[in-house]
Amino acid sequence: MIGIYSPGIWRIPHLEKFLAQPCQKLSLLRPVPQEVDAIAVWGHRPSAAKPVAIAKAAGKPVIRLEDGFVRSLDLGVNGEPPLSLVVDDYCIYYDASKPSALEKLVQDKAGNTALISQAREAMHTIVTGDLSKYNLAPAFVADESERSDIVLVVDQTFNDMSVTYGNAGPHEFAAMLEAAMAENPQAEIWVKVHPDVLEGKKTGYFAALRATQRVRLIAENVSPQSLLRHVSRVYVVTSQYGFEALLAGKPVTCFGQPWYAGWGLTDDRHPQSALLSARRGSATLEELFAAAYLRYCRYIDPQTGEVSNLFTVLQWLQLQRRHLQQRNGYLWAPGLTLWKSAILKPFLQTATNRLSFSRRCTAASACVVWGVKGEQQWRAEAQRKSLPLWRMEDGFLRSSGLGSDLLPPLSLVLDKRGIYYDATRPSDLEVLLNHSQLTLAQQMRAEKLRQRLVESKLSKYNLGADFSLPAEAKDKKIILVPGQVEDDASIKTGTVSIKSNLELLRTVRERNPHAYIIYKPHPDVLVGNRKGNIPTELIAELADYQALDADIIQCIQRADEVHTMTSLSGFEALLHGKQVHCYGLPFYAGWGLTVDEHHCPRREQKLTIADLIYQTLIVYPTYIHPTLLQPISVEEAAEYLIQTPRKPMFITRKKAGRVIRYYRKLIMFCKVRFG
């Protein structure tokens, strides 16, 4: 049992999970209960002095708590609960006067060596994912005229415990700035103000400093890694910024004695630095990281509140951060129906942006439209307002049912360059694929996702009945030809020569006269919602079998090859290890994974299936939980779809009537809007 005097500590969500023990709230006016084994306090705060004295008098050990090094999305001073804590029964990591549990962990070479590969993976994620202790700050945007020789000097909050117990104070901050200017006479000096100071909650050591010709105050709240990319050297007193600079590969000079100094990785200027180095010894950056982030810190799963690990927290923070950063500003999404605006709202609106669906907007920073059709309608107005056009479309794991039946999507994509199915220009997805360089962990994640999708038979719409091959298909090459919606934008912008289902089917038959061809009409065409029907007599002439209401994944599994114009079924077939022939230029063609009729010169890289899966399903789309209305990972979206009962498909050759479609629209709008 751990005793808690501090109301602030007592209010920390999931405290008992962090401490791995039950906790009891104590009163300063009563004796320490016998069942209490230790007293927890917050670092070296002055408020901890009395509980420490009480614990000492009662013969109870003291446990010191602090925020972990990857803490949360927003700042702690704004009330954001921690996702990570450190629990130290020796001292606390920022107290340089004596060894802490962290210092002892760093010196445990064997324990850290076992975690080196994990440390490298996490370090890579933090640097490339622009992650830090706090993760709500936007990325730093440099001026085009920026100098190349820039030195960063990091301020801290006045009387911060890490400064005091890092054997530093105002003198060290003054000496640091003086040294930075003297040692880098040709450089511009950037002074980074602490986020808590920017929020107006605290003051800093450089509060009186003013910008000069050489000194620039970085007074905006920006993410550390995005700022560090622009500097050549970093000066700190005891700030955690110094360690994050080491992760970014920058030389770091320390004027105090932070936890990462004294190991041979920093340029230490403190008068007592030799004594600290003698006590601490040497360590590599990976060993320091493994000890601090993987062993010293404790983590809570942001979604379940259960004990977790650094990688779960990093993945969640990266997901939330990417969602927020992609939607910064004042978004204007004009010309949408009530239905479309209702389903787009949770995908576009965040806690940090503004969103308008009106047909007129005067202060927007971007115009969001639905696909190519919306772009054509609003391009001129966006150009008149000098607004960038962002396109949205359905994602690749959409729903359990058809979009044309007005079922709300589980995933959408937001593309600021083009859109994935438009082969006439680059898209965000194409750029991601052209630059894909996966780490081993990312490759493993992609393969694990592929296996889960294959074993669960997930597809975009998750519709259809069981399918078995007819007996006459035995010993023949099985070719699946998926039909498409012929007036769909992917046909208009992704095809070159063959542009209709009939042309495709005829071409496949001509080139494969002895194959057993299965034609699978598009579900939207089958249910009467969209264009693309082939007369029955022509299908009978060109195909051996028509799989009407069959599950597309079961059709893929039973085929040897899939021949398509631009259908997503081709991508799904690649996941199942099938040979795919592309007669158009879908997003997955041109990377060395398909047999291609046409060439796209922009697609320069030869990809693995892991590259394609990772960028297409993990990075590019946004997944929103339909009831929580929060961003979720592709794995969580897949599990949600797996647990959702599959819907039957009602086949008709007539387009659904206007009354029926309005009725469907009303029902689904009410479900989305009012739950």
Swiss-Prot record:
The protein's UniProt keywords, in alphabetical order, are: Capsule biogenesis/degradation, Cytoplasm, Polysaccharide transport, Sugar transport, Transport
What GO CC terms are in its UniProt record?
Answer: cytoplasm
Pfam family, any one: Capsule_synth
One example of a Gene Ontology biological process annotation: polysaccharide biosynthetic process
CDD domains, per the entry = beta_Kdo_transferase_KpsC, beta_Kdo_transferase_KpsC_2
The reply on keyword Mitochondrion is: no
**Highest taxon of source:** Bacteria
- Subcellular compartments: Cytoplasm
Check the record and name the InterPro entries matching this protein.
Answer: Capsule_polysaccharide_synth (IPR007833)
Its principal location? cytoplasm
Per the record, the similarity remark reads: To R.meliloti lipopolysaccharide processing protein LpsZ.
Q: What is this protein called?
A: Capsule polysaccharide export protein KpsC
| Organism field | Escherichia coli
Which taxonomic lineage is given here? Bacteria, Pseudomonadati, Pseudomonadota, Gammaproteobacteria, Enterobacterales
What gene codes for this chain? Answer: kpsC
